[in-house]
C-alpha cells in the first residue's frame, strides 16, 4: 500500500453504547469516531473514505478541542450528524490527552468509536523510505527508533481501541473496502464479521480474532484439473466442501460463534475478524471462507464481508 506516512486510515468501526453519566443524561445514537494509529499505517486514506461516505472529518485536532467539537455536532440543531477526528502523535498534547478526552466523552454519554490503524515495522519502514520522509518521533535517531517510540506511546490506546486494522498486507483498495463496510455497519447497529482467507506461507493476519486452519482438508492443488482454478470457482468449491469433515467443521464453528457473539455484543465488541488459512491461500481457505460467509450472511443481525488476501499471490 503506497500511503504517505503521516497520513491516517481507519478500520472497521464499532458502535459503542456507554451508559449515561447521570439519570438525566440524554440518550443519543450519535457516535463520534476517533481515528488514530501508527504514522504511515493509512490514516489519511481512512479519512478520505469517511468523507466520501458523508462524514465530517477533521485532521490533527488537539485532544482538548475534540470534546467541544463533538458536543457542538451532537446538538439537535447541528447540520453535522457524523463526525470523525484524526488524531496522531504530531499533536503536542497527544500523550495522555487523548485518553483523558475519551474518558470525558464517555462521561457525557458521547462515547466514541476508536479506530486504530497498525502495520508491521518493516512495512512502515518501507513506506517511509518510499516517500523519503522522516518519522515525526525519530528526531536525530533512526527511523526504527521513531517507530519504536511511537509504538510504545500508543500501546495502551491500541489495547483499548474498539477496532484495530493491520494494513500491512492491504492495498489502498482493500483498505477502502474494509472501511466502507465497517462504517456502514455503524448505522445498522449490527455485528460485523469479516472473513479473511489467507495462506500460512505468507503469514497469518495479525488482526484476526480467530485463526482457523483449513489444511485438514485435501488440497485441490494436487488435482491436475483443479490446479488452475481458485476457491471461488465452482469446481474447486464443490471439491473442497464435499470432503469429509468440511460440513461438520462449518456447523461446529458456526455453533461456537452462536455461543460467543452475544457475549461480544454485550462487551461492545461488534467487529469480529475470522482468519481461515490453507497453504497458499488459493483453494481450501477461499472455498471455506465463501461458504461460511454465505451461511452467516443469511442472518439479519450480522453484516458479513469476505477478503481473500492471497488469492492472486503467486
From Swiss-Prot:
GTP binds at residues 88-91. One of its GO terms (molecular function) is ATP binding. The keyword Cytoplasm does not apply. The keyword Nucleotide-binding applies. This is Nucleotide-binding protein CE1710. NCBIfam families: PRK05416.1. Residues 1-29 are annotated as: Disordered. Pfam families: PapZ_C, RapZ-like_N. Keywords: ATP-binding, GTP-binding, Nucleotide-binding. InterPro entries: P-loop_NTPase, RapZ-like, RapZ-like_N, RapZ_C. Belongs to the RapZ-like family. PANTHER family: RNASE ADAPTER PROTEIN RAPZ. It comes from the Bacteria. ATP binds at residues 37-44. Residues 7-29 have a biased composition (Low complexity). Displays ATPase and GTPase activities. It comes from Corynebacterium efficiens (strain DSM 44549 / YS-314 / AJ 12310 / JCM 11189 / NBRC 100395).
